[in-house]
């Protein structure tokens, strides 16, 4: 079901109202505590700026790291408040806690257009337990709820789900709306042919996604370390490559399922091998039926890149989740970079290209092609669960579109 969005609320409905906005500000920081990538902060700006323009009193809630219900000074949101202040061009008010007298007093004293950032919501144990008393206390800060934290939407926590029971309306922010539009749209009503490229090292972490995508897609292309589990299941020798021996039957079953549904399931035909797992390992290219003992596959080979490019050529929608190899090592990044380049070209031709979270986002950004894709998801686990066809609690809690 489609969810109600912030765009449905007018300035008249929001002016002077305190609006609780759950955002995803779980940004990477270096040893000094400086933010190394502010993408997630910038992704929330359209929602925050719209609320400011409509005269709302904006109360932002976010988590950072895994403090496990304890106050941890290294996980305070102070650097985030500073960066957000710079991006907005005016001071963001920061609280010492997400509940209690300081938060209440600052919320009550907000003026129209002010922005306040609550301290790390995971400092309170009730957040991850979805404690109704804690959710109620959060709700008392505001009158309207907006969820713009797609990256946390797969968690039924107090700030993503529990709080909606005490506030109304509960709507999606613009980032959440865009994520659902692209990811849900690709699953429910894609322009076809629809292809999925699934990579990563383990079949076990992508079982649900592969099961679901084989049901929905016209083509499924598999790369990354998980290919060796499929090869071993076919009876091929894989040398020292990563294999999940307890998933061999599953790999066979997935190939059978694709065959029975008439879905084109493509695996690489050649691989780039290394004699050890390091950036400066010796390397060679081998066909999949002639991988020598003592070598491990760390990337898809050039023939496979061509095979995948040809398969994608006529596609109208492509979802990519997971790299083709160990792209962090330059010697073994060609497969991943080639797929990124291919998708950027397809995008320019009108194909809808969706980078579905996690390492594939990092790969596209490393290749400098992020701005060439139709949509880059901000959710890791949330993207996977949505592609698996699961209900996301943070989305389910929002008001239905009339």
Curated annotation (Swiss-Prot):
The keyword Kinase applies. Pathway: Carbohydrate degradation; glycolysis; pyruvate from D-glyceraldehyde 3-phosphate: step 2/5. ATP binds at residues 206, 297, 328, 357-360. Substrate binds at residues 24-26, 40, 63-66, 122, 155. Keywords: ATP-binding, Cytoplasm, Glycolysis, Kinase, Nucleotide-binding, Transferase. Monomer. Belongs to the phosphoglycerate kinase family. This is Phosphoglycerate kinase. It comes from Prochlorococcus marinus (strain MIT 9211).
């Amino acid at each position: 079901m489609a969810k109600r969005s912030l765009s449905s609320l007018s300035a008249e409905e929001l002016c002077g109202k305190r609006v609780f906005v759950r955002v995803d500000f779980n940004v990477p920081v270096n040893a000094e505590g400086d933010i190394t990538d502010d993408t997630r902060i910038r992704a929330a700006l359209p929602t925050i700026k719209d609320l400011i323009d409509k005269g709302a009193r904006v109360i932002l809630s976010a988590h950072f790291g895994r403090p496990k219900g304890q106050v941890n000074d290294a996980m305070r949101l102070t650097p985030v408040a500073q960066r957000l202040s710079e991006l907005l061009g005016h001071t963001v008010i920061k609280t010492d806690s997400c509940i209690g007298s300081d938060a209440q007093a600052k919320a009550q004293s907000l003026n129209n257009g002010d922005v306040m950032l609550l301290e790390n919501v995971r400092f309170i144990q009730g957040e991850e337990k979805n404690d109704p008393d804690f959710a109620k206390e959060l709700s008392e800060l505001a009158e309207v709820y907006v969820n713009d934290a797609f990256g946390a939407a797969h968690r039924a926590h107090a700030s993503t789900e529990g709080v909606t029971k005490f506030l109304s309306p509960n709507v999606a922010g613009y980032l959440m709306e865009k994520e659902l539009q692209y990811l849900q749209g690709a699953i429910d009503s894609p322009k076809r042919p629809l292809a999925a490229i699934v990579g990563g090292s383990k079949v076990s972490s992508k079982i649900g996604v592969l099961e679901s995508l084989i049901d929905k897609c016209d083509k499924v292309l598999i790369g990354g370390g998980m290919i060796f589990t499929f090869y071993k299941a076919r009876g091929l020798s894989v040398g020292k490559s990563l294999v999940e021996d307890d998933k061999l039957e599953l790999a066979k079953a997935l190939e059978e399922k694709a065959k029975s549904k008439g879905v084109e399931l493509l695996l690489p035909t050649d691989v780039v091998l290394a004699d050890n797992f390091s950036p400066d390992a010796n390397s060679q290219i081998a066909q999949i039926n002639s991988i020598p003992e003592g070598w491990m596959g760390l990337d898809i080979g050039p023939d496979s890149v061509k095979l995948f490019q040809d398969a994608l050529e006529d596609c109208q929608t492509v979802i990519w989740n997971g790299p083709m190899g160990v792209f962090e090592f330059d010697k073994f990044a060609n497969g991943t970079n080639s797929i990124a380049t291919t998708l950027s070209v397809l995008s320019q031709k009108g194909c809808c290209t969706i980078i579905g979270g996690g390492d594939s986002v990092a790969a596209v950004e490393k290749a400098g092609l992020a701005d060439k894709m139709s949509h880059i998801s901000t959710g890791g686990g949330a993207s996977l669960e949505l592609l698996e066809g699961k209900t996301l609690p943070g989305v389910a809690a929002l008001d239905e579109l009339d």
